[in-house]
Amino acid sequence: MAGYLRAVSSLCRASGSTRTWAPAALNVPSWPEQPRRHYAEKRIKVEKPVVEMDGDEMTRIIWQFIKEKLILPHVDVQLKYFDLGLPNRDQTNDQVTIDSALATQKYSVAVKCATITPDEARVEEFKLKKMWKSPNGTIRNILGGTVFREPIICKNIPRLVPGWTKPITIGRHAHGDQYKATDFVVDRAGMFKLVFTPKDGSGAKEWEVYNFPAGGVGMGMYNTDESISGFAHSCFQYSIQKKWPLYLSTKNTIMKAYDGRFKDIFQEIFDKHYKTDFDKNKIWYEHRLIDDMVAQVLKSSGGFVWACKNYDGDVQSDILAQGFGSLGLMTSVLVCPDGKTIEAEAAHGTVTRHYREHQKGRPTSTNPIASIFAWTRGLEHRGKLDGNQDLIRFAQTLEKVCVQTVESGAMTKDLAGCIHGLSNVKLNEHFLNTTDFLDTIKSNLDRALGKQ
């Protein structure tokens, strides 16, 4: 039944915004589409555009190097550029984030740099109009789909969980729940209720959540059968493609209606559409309680797909990334329900601590590999959609070059720390600074492409 759900409490607030397009002043340069100078005479021609979403802080600086030194010298692609740096999101009242998602729907492929999600400290630092929501959350709620995160395996990088001998892919449901919730602060005694008003005009339903004796906090969140079904189909299809078993984790023993709906929809879709293919591939699907699943993951050898609700996927993907070596070695791709629209991004944040060092003029050793893989996964998908084998080969070659560079002993400090311990590593003996590492990848890529 369609309808309108609202949260009622003793405290309410209204907010509005006006769209403006004043250019933002950034601490680092703003990078519009760059002139095509000094590029190779014969570049791979890409017929259709790719949406580029720029970001913040250290990753923004690295992103520019990747684009200008690793991608555009070899690939002739039209980039539909959107500056998602926090100052520009503030200048445009976050309209630029919405526009970038709509452009992704139009062109089917986007690559995204890491961005800041502001908290109170960031609001003060950037003098923001308001505490803007997560750009990733906004984009994902427009596009729908599932975020699949998988580790990049380098043979010489030891795992914190040595038993993980095979990759573990997390499928994160990128819609609703906490990321599209309405939350608020209660500053006095009062009743918090949820009210659902059916669209067909029938009587409203009301639930009493809590009778506040004093201040506190409240939240209302939602998800939809359509989105959960799309999530399920994506996960089952991905498991069949990988020939790995699939596990769905929820807390349906506590959230009997909410999480129970996830469990029921997955089971119905599996029984109706995928059980035969799973049996044929000798793989299986199971539902697990989230706490039981976390324990099982630590004891496993890997080699499975883990379907997580939105918040669980956000948290557990970072744990897996560190367990496999580093957040800098984790791919992240949002796959939409239509099967052709994707948005590829780095799984980590903007590396603020390194950016503060950069602002002081000090060299950093920041791992760019996840950001490089955002570009390669996006370009590879563009190649698959367009039937462009040269573009696919280029993306795969750049990925292999990154892995082989690390396996040859050239790496950033975070990876060297996995091998030797962070307190024991020395610059130029065990690791390279950011610029030198990127230059090494560039030289190795040129060599692999036969351009040296």
Curated annotation (Swiss-Prot):
The modification N6-succinyllysine is found at K80, K106, K166, K180, K193, K256, K282, K384. Keywords: Acetylation, Glyoxylate bypass, Magnesium, Manganese, Metal-binding, Mitochondrion, NADP, Oxidoreductase, Transit peptide, Tricarboxylic acid cycle. GO terms for molecular function: isocitrate dehydrogenase (NADP+) activity; magnesium ion binding; NAD binding. Acetylation at Lys-413 dramatically reduces catalytic activity. Deacetylated by SIRT3. NADP(+) binds at T115, I116, T117, R122, K299, G349, T350, V351, T352, R353, H354, N367. It catalyses: D-threo-isocitrate + NADP(+) = 2-oxoglutarate + CO2 + NADPH. Its EC number is 1.1.1.42. It is found in: Mitochondrion. Belongs to the isocitrate and isopropylmalate dehydrogenases family. Homodimer. This is Isocitrate dehydrogenase [NADP], mitochondrial. The gene is Idh2.
